[in-house]
Amino acid sequence: MQRIMAKKNIFTDAFGTPYFLKRMVIFILGMVSYRRFNGFNKLKISGSENLINLPDTNVLFVSNHQTYFADVAAMYHAFCAVNNGYMNTIKNPVYLLNPKVDFYYVAAEETMNKGILARIFKIAGAVTVKRTWRSEGKNVNRMVDMNEVDNIMKALDNGWVITFPQGTTSAFAQGRKGTAKLIKKQRPIVIPIKINGFRRAFDKKGLKIKVTGVQPTMEFKKPLDIDYDNESPQEILEKVMYAIEQTDEFNLLHEYDNELKNKNNSQ
């Protein structure tokens, strides 16, 4: 059965949130968080040129994940800055007056339903999903809710979407094949994002500053070259995980473990 694409509305986003409310929330959250990225700590952005001339819809950003909220907040700053012609910098927060509103991010439902601040973040563009492998700190095994997949595709039909293919803030966790299946089906332009330093600068939620003087980094890479017809979801996933530098070859501890094993085997 053919999927019906959601029609654009000049007053609301893909899920009915009024644009004026979304603009207000992005502006307030942006001003509150600004000093975290250009004051107490200095966010270093690179690769903004890879965001120029992208289409307004069906662009999927895939990123590693280090905190619940600081990662996404920093990305909002970067996208809004580029939307107003500021490349690789967030030094002039005037860009918050003209934010990119057709912008969404995939987030765990349980995270976005905890506390008033999480609910405010949700208004800014969260597309919530129930994790199939983890819930309330316990391992689970449940089926994917296809309505949630449809919501992500609806968001892509209407704008840009960020997803975190590992589904966790743990470094070098395995990628989830659902992201690759979505890519193969929806055929978006896929832009990898590599972030670093957020885990050191902020607490796990990304709300409290742990250390000042840190320079978190955010690198926007070139679009992935994907053969949507012939590459399998597993091949696409491997390409995504390598691009966001979450495979074993980027894990220094993994290399160290291998060196120890080789040393022990040779003795």
Task: For the regions a language model picked out, list residue spans one by one.
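A cross-family acyltransferase "interaction/gating" segment
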Residues: D157-I162, G167-E235
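A transmembrane-helix-recognition feature enriched in membrane-embedded lipid enzymes
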Residues: Q2-S46, A74, G115-A124
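Short, highly charged C-terminal tails/helix-capping segments
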Residues: H254-Q267
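Helix-to-loop junction immediately C-terminal to a conserved catalytic motif
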Residues: S33-Q66, Y76
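Amphipathic coiled-coil/heptad-repeat helices and related helical stalk/stem segments
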Residues: K44-G47, N113, D145-V149, G175-T179
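Catalytic core of membrane glycerolipid acyltransferases/transacylases, capturing the structured
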Residues: P55-V140
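Internal catalytic-core helix/loop-beta-alpha segment
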Residues: V127-F172
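Short, flexible loop segments at the rims of nucleotide/cofactor-binding pockets, characterized by
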Residues: L21-K22, R35-K42, V106, G137-M143, ...
